């Protein structure tokens, strides 16, 4: 395979990945916002299953199949990107029906088996909704259960991977400053650290003054303990030269972010404030720029009008006197008669070239409007942050492990498998964030007195908020991991 064909295939994969990311970011929130919880869960588990099956077939074909099977599975894998919109429309149209809602609420014929229900409903108009119900019951509900119980995994793994990324940034900055002997990197790292610490202190101040999250005595005490430990670890890393200024500032900023994540409403408000600030700055600078028409208006007002003027210049304005045979032949084949014949084609071409982009523009505007009303900036920012941390971990962990060639190849195969199944991980992560910020996750978590068998009789139940509890666990686990790395590492 030539380098040109490899570059072409790589470009195609990148375009398909961007197309998939865009459609995933837009379609999943729309399914939850428009269709409801059941529609969103059904749509996401269908996407997850499709990507899991096609990825597995692709991996098996690459390992055991020939070129024909590899080509077929590749086509199957990349073609599913184009059916996301059709799947979204299918589930939106299905769950918008009132009959299906009644079926889901009343648990339609729960005593019957799946085959019996299908057999009894063959002559009924509700066969599609029966299929929807059982699909929801046997596929979607386990998916919802897994997402509900996966909060500790996503939260704690994010903290661990973030520590790896922070230390990788610190090592890179240390190499740029010492090995290259460049004062520019030292000054830039100090300026960056100062900006990060200033922004973190500002948003830490907002936590104490905002009425969105009322602080109790226990919460304020925990915050004071956490901030004291973080500042102490940061100063210890700088003084002992086991860390750096950029590491300490990023670590402090991440802990402040985790504190915001304890309250989803607080995190959403902070994200909206940041985006509104960027929006105000952009609008202020945009007023100073000369406004111009958009591309479609330019296409209609300039290009089409110039084409009409050019076309009209070919048409003779007056009739000339024709005396000889040559002039008669020219008059027969004149531009006037040619224009009469080709005028309908020109009108069709003109209307087609304007109406089709206009319809596409209207469709895109409707989609963007639905997406803007459905997509939460806090969810997208959290998703991008988690994807970045998880991707960084897949690069950092193999680099930290000193292995022989055989173990290194095995580690690379594992990381390659993670890359192959990354769409499934992304769908699960995105759906979990949407459920978290919409309040659909199980909020109550019993940590004491839940079972008489384990805790004994007459033990008081201690029930806490699930999301807040696991975020506090993430904060303390992250501090513990970073402290272990600082104390256990050499200077």
UniProtKB/Swiss-Prot annotation:
Residues 1-13, 62-74, 171-184, 240-294, 395-413, 483-491 are cytoplasmic. It is found in: Endoplasmic reticulum membrane. Residues 35-40, 96-149, 206-218, 316-373, 435-461 are lumenal. GO terms for molecular function: protein serine/threonine phosphatase inhibitor activity. It is a multi-pass membrane protein. Its main location: endoplasmic reticulum. InterPro entries: Ice2. One of its GO terms (biological process) is endoplasmic reticulum inheritance. This is Protein ICE2. It comes from Saccharomyces cerevisiae (strain ATCC 204508 / S288c). The gene is ICE2.
